[in-house]
């Protein structure tokens, strides 16, 4: 974390946001749900197709916007040096998608959901759209950077929220001066730096209620069992 802070120029960025407020723009019942599959819907594998369909089925009044290689520039403006490093394979598509989701949330607000999330109930029954921030605050089954306080695969906030603003500054500062990532969990470490140093972000993250989440990946090679599915969906 210390190395990431130094390489990202965290000291000056933290100073910029230290006394900032969260910005109380609500998530809203009609904000977009952002899902990314770079190759487009026609090239989704079966699991992603099912998850994407579940998001649309449970979206309520939220428009579901699929971000692809062909349309992402309609919604997000990225610095030329970032796009060049993606083209040169210095930034992987995985880490580019980290910046893309933060860019979308900062500029438009909304809900980011990874393409392999299966929705089993309506989005607005999972979170309160009148709040300004939501993520999956859960009891961690193992020790990691987030320790259950957040997940980067599901984040929701209103437009111009302080967290994506801080994270985007950190991402851009890092990649302006470096050609490779220092750890796969770079995104989580940036959130951790924000959580530990920006009081408004600490308060915002801590305000999210505890949520039960289920990991279906361990069941991928097992026959479908309706009872087990009901338990996962409870």
Sequence positions of predicted segments:
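Glycosyltransferase-associated regions of secretory-pathway enzymes
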Residues: 1-97, 115-234
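Small-residue hinge/turn detector
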Residues: 98-108
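Active-site acidic Asp-centered loop
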Residues: 108, 113-115
């Amino acid at each position: 974390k210390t190395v990431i802070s130094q390489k990202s120029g965290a000291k000056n960025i933290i100073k910029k946001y230290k006394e900032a407020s969260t910005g109380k723009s609500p998530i809203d019942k009609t904000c977009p749900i952002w899902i990314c599959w770079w190759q487009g819907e026609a090239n989704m594998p079966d699991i992603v197709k099912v998850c994407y369909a579940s998001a649309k089925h449970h979206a309520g009044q939220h428009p579901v916007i699929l971000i692809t290689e062909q349309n992402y520039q309609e919604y997000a403006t990225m610095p030329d040096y970032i796009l060049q490093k993606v083209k040169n394979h210095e930034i992987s598509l995985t880490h580019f998608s980290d910046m893309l989701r933060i860019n979308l949330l900062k500029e438009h607000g909304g809900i980011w959901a990874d393409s392999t999330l299966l929705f089993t109930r309506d989005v607005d029954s999972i979170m309160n759209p009148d709040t300004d921030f939501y993520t999956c605050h859960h009891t961690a089954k193992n020790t990691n950077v987030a320790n259950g306080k957040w997940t980067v695969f599901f984040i929701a906030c209103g437009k111009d929220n302080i967290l994506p603003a801080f994270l985007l500054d950190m991402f851009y500062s890092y990649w302006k001066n470096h050609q490779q990532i220092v750890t796969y969990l770079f995104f989580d470490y940036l959130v951790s730096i924000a959580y530990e140093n920006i009081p408004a972000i600490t308060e915002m993250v801590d305000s999210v209620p505890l949520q039960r989440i289920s990991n279906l990946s361990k069941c991928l090679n097992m026959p479908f069992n309706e009872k087990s599915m009901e338990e996962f969906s409870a």
